[in-house]
Amino acid sequence: MELAFRESLKKMRGTKSKEKFSQELEMSRSNYSRIESGKSDPTIKTLEQIVKLTNSTLVVDLIPNEPTEPEPETEQVTLELEMEEEKSNDFV
């Protein structure tokens, strides 16, 4: 998991010990420690428990790794449609 998530998790845990927080999440301290240290990713169920326990909101965002460009076939179809529209507008 990203550093921002781990830092947020530590901040939300506040002054509670890892032992206490993991008990409230109904998981072992070692499993919680692996999540907080970034050695393991939490399950959706665990994320839901963290949200409930910390009265927070979970935001998931999908960001492409690199810009996606339309396939050449898609560009061709788009160009053909534009040409057809221009032709039909010429007759109006």
From Swiss-Prot:
Gene3D superfamilies named in the record: lambda repressor-like DNA-binding domains (1.10.260.40)
Source organism superkingdom: Bacteria
This protein's record includes keyword Transcription regulation: yes
Protein name: Plasmid copy control protein CopR
DNA-binding feature ranges: 20-39
Job description of the protein: Involved in copy control of plasmid pIP501.
An annotated Gene Ontology molecular function: DNA binding
Compositionally biased residues, Basic and acidic residues: 1-27
Biological process per Gene Ontology, one example term: plasmid maintenance
Region annotation (Disordered) ranges: 1-40, 63-92
InterPro entries (UniProt xref): Cro/C1-type_HTH, Lambda_DNA-bd_dom_sf
Entry keyword 4Fe-4S: no
Keywords linked to the UniProt accession: DNA-binding, Plasmid, Plasmid copy control, Transcription, Transcription regulation
SUPFAM superfamilies assigned to the protein according to its UniProt record, in alphabetical order: lambda repressor-like DNA-binding domains
Boundaries of every HTH cro/C1-type domain copy: 9-62
